[in-house]
A protein has these predicted regions:
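A cross-family kinase active-site recognition segment
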Residues: 2-14, 117-173, 190-191, 218-222
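Juxta-kinase regulatory segment immediately upstream of eukaryotic protein kinase catalytic domains
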Residues: 2-47
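A conserved alpha-helical element in kinase catalytic cores
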Residues: 32, 64-109, 116-138
Length: 298
């Protein structure tokens, strides 16, 4: 009788454990078995150390034909379930290529990109220009009907905002104001395919195109909802200008100019993104208050 096959022993990165031990403990426990399953199913050989963010485990692999690729293991949830669909909808330009995917688990096999992100571009203004040019091309694509909608997300935000009670009266007034603004935007919340997390770390260098976008959290909605992630990333570069408020406005204006997004809607939906992040944290991040002040959202 053959001995039972045991799953590969792996050391799960601490950041991944911290992110998922409460919400997805079963997924963490199944990772070794799941890794073996997809290595076998897609005829892959591991070729390097694990990479990871807070949400997924990235495994460098080589396909049977010798092609280098990345195996992405992640819990299946509302953010990940349409990732492959979104990337294939945008494909072949501007985004990483999906080589294989399993819709049942949101597991992806992706083309191997370089490890360099837009965070490595020394000039943050040039990095923003590159990001905005990519964004401008992505936001013209209609969203597939399977993708969840900004209309639903915004409706949930307004409902949750009604129950949020902050200690600071001024911050509470901002929450109430932003919720009112979002409520007015809901009837025209858009139908374009949005990335929802388009910041400098999610744009990687590539051999087939200078820069490619990775890791969307797909949403059907108004492109004006896309700007916020780039506003609050590479924050130290904004601070280093010596005039933080002006640097925020300059970055915002650059993205609006390149993408062609309506400025008033961009301001309104940026207030909505501030509200969303406050609802997630039950508090105002000082950076978000600074952005709100600089853009006169207060």
């Amino acid at each position: 009788m053959a001995a039972p096959t045991l799953p590969t022993v792996i050391v799960i990165p601490a950041q991944l454990i911290e992110s998922h031990q409460d919400e997805s403990p079963e997924w963490l426990a199944a990772l070794p078995t799941q890794l073996d399953e997809y290595l076998a199913r897609w005829e892959l050989t591991r070729s390097g150390d694990f990479l990871n963010g807070a949400a997924s485990l990235i495994v460098p692999v080589v396909r049977r034909d010798g092609t280098a690729a990345m195996l992405k293991l992640q819990p299946r949830n509302e953010e990940s379930e349409a990732e492959a669909l979104a990337l294939r909808t945008w494909s072949p330009n501007d985004v990483v290529t999906v080589l294989e995917d399993d819709q049942a688990t949101s597991t992806l096999l992706l083309e191997r990109l370089h490890g360099r992100t837009l965070n490595a571009v020394p000039d943050h203004v040039e990095a923003t220009r590159i990001l905005a040019e990519l964004m401008a091309r992505l936001i013209v694509v209609p969203a597939p009907p399977e993708v969840r909608t900004l209309e639903d997300i915004a409706t949930e935000m307004v409902e949750e905002a009604a129950d949020l009670k902050l200690d600071d009266p001024a911050e509470q007034r901002l929450v109430n104001r932003y919720a009112d603004q979002v409520r007015e935007l809901i009837p025209e919340s858009g139908d374009r395919l949005l990335h929802w997390d388009l910041h400098y770390g999610n744009v990687l260098a590539s051999g087939r195109q200078p820069w490619l976008v990775i890791d969307p959290k797909p949403l059907a909605g108004d492109p004006a909802f896309e700007l916020f992630q780039a506003l609050h990333n590479r924050w130290d570069d904004l601070v280093a200008t010596g005039n933080l408020d002006q640097a925020i406005r300059d970055r915002f204006d650059l993205m609006v100019d390149i993408t062609g997004i309506d400025r008033d809607r961009a301001l309104a939906w940026t207030a909505g993104r501030v509200l969303q992040n406050v609802l997630w944290a039950d508090a105002f991040d000082p950076r978000y208050l600074t952005i709100a002040t600089a853009l006169k959202l207060t």
